[in-house]
């Protein structure tokens, strides 16, 4: 009962943010977000999406292998594409990750470790975004927000995101807390693990920022990249909050606030976030092909299990 109530609450909060933006800024920002996208932006999204997906899948491979699980890069890329697509079209924005975690764990004969590999991989990505957000926003005070407020916002976002991930019951299994801690040390903190994982996470973040820049230019923003990057980092950080509808909600709200605070206009921030959301969905579309082509294989696997 509590799980069901929390699931509905998350969706309602995300929907509430979008409704509030709709009432405050009108429909034009949403309409413009669809109208300004051209073939050039679509191809850019597909290219950037390929790069970020490969980088993220590679990160997953590193974590999984450190935990003793087999995972080839080609298979990881296909599974990651499918997860991104499901995350984009299904509520909550994490159901695709749940599927790839459970499927990989079952195939490797260790469901708990398969799930932990995905959780740790996602934590690594979020950690880099949080660190980048703190570093960039403190280094570039031209955003217009007081430094104390920035720290409070980032701190709250970080605490909520980490608490949400840590509280997830599917991160646990019957092996107990000691095995989970051991996997964290091996998968993320080991000397031969964290440098590569950090580098891949930083490169993937750069790709997401590049897609945001494409979105900003599509809506006609003439602001320099140095001014846009802090706004984009904070918007990306908001996507980690577990109160969204397929990634929509907090990202658009934060983008409207920070673009407005920077003097670029809340409407431009909202339109940029909408364009980014559409382009991110376009970038995940290869995952739909993976889902269709691999469906018969998955059905046979489920019968075998």
Placement of each model-derived feature along the sequence:
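Transmembrane alpha-helix interface/packing and boundary motifs in multi-pass membrane proteins
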Residues: 84-92, 233-248, 252
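Mid-bilayer segments of alpha-helical transmembrane spans in multi-pass integral membrane proteins
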Residues: 84-94, 122-134
């Amino acid at each position: 009962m509590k799980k069901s109530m929390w699931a509905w609450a998350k969706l309602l909060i995300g929907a509430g943010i979008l409704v509030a933006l709709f009432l405050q800024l009108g429909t034009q920002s949403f309409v413009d977000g669809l109208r300004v996208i051209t073939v050039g932006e679509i191809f850019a999204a597909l290219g950037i999406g390929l790069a970020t997906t490969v980088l993220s899948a590679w990160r997953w491979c590193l974590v999984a292998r450190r935990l003793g699980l087999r995972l080839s890069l080609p298979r990881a890329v296909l599974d990651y594409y499918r997860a991104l697509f499901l995350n984009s079209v299904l509520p909550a924005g994490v159901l695709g990750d749940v599927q790839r975690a459970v499927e990989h764990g079952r195939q490797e004969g260790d469901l708990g470790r398969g799930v932990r590999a995905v959780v740790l991989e996602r934590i690594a990505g979020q950690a880099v975004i949080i660190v980048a957000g703190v570093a960039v926003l403190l280094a570039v005070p031209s955003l217009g927000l007081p430094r104390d407020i920035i720290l409070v916002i980032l701190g709250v976002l970080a605490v909520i995101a980490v608490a949400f991930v840590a509280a997830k019951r599917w991160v646990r299994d019957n092996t107990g807390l000691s095995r989970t801690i051991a996997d964290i040390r091996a998968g993320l903190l080991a000397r031969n693990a964290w440098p590569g994982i950090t580098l891949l996470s930083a490169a993937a973040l750069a790709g997401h920022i590049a897609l945001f820049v494409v979105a900003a230019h599509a809506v006609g923003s003439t602001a320099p990249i140095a001014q846009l990057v802090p706004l984009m980092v904070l918007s990306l950080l908001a996507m980690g909050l577990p109160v969204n509808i397929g990634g929509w909600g907090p990202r658009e709200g934060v983008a409207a606030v920070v673009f407005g605070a920077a003097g670029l206009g809340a409407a431009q921030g909202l339109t940029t976030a909408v364009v980014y959301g559409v382009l991110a969905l376009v970038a995940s579309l290869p995952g739909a092909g993976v889902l269709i082509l691999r469906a018969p294989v998955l059905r046979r696997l489920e019968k075998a299990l």
